[in-house]
Amino acid sequence: MESHKPSTSKDDLILNIISRKIKQLPESDRNLLEYGSAYIGLNAAFGGLIANSLFRRILNVTQARLASSLPMAVIPFLTANLSYQSLVSLPLSTGDLNCETCTTTRGALVGLVMGGLYPILLAIPVNGGLAARYESSPLPQRGNIFNYWITVSKPVFRKMLFPTLLQTVFASYLGSRQYKLLIKALQLPEPDLEIH
């Protein structure tokens, strides 16, 4: 059995062509392709702050506002941004993702999981730890921990349904839009190509 080495020269050529074509796009389109993942990250950060606020109210946590808000904004921003960048934007830019449905689906999944559900799930231990530290809410005994957090989380998940769906639809739309912009860029003529 032969071991196949990836053809880096072919991949480099494809990447070079795609990057040249993207540079020909108008600045607003280029910015959407380059910084689209940051929009997903910002929405995830807002979702994290909303989830943090809801859990703080339920658990009556009044201390350490900055200590809980900072990680609830920064961590979801970074994870959603990097996830979208590595699963949607980068494969699009390198030519590894060439299907609009695949791009839209990947964008929606990143928006749902990393932009919607992850910030809510991250808020549970952050605010649970603060509630235990400041004794602001009676916490359960060892046997009831799972049921307690399900009961506490249900109203938060209900209230976060709309922001999570909004994040999913936005990420799906952004994936579709980025795909269409890339197709538009690839259809542009080469400015310095000489025809003999």
From Swiss-Prot:
The name this protein goes by in its record: Transmembrane protein 126A
Cellular localization per UniProt: Mitochondrion inner membrane
InterPro entries in the cross-refs: TMEM126
Signal sequence residues: none
Keywords: Membrane, Mitochondrion, Mitochondrion inner membrane, Transmembrane, Transmembrane helix
The protein's assembly and partners: Interacts with OXA1L; promoting cotranslational quality control in mitochondria.
Membrane topology reported for the UniProt record: Multi-pass membrane protein
UniProt keyword Membrane, yes or no: yes
Annotated Pfam families: TMEM126
Record-stated family: Belongs to the TMEM126 family.
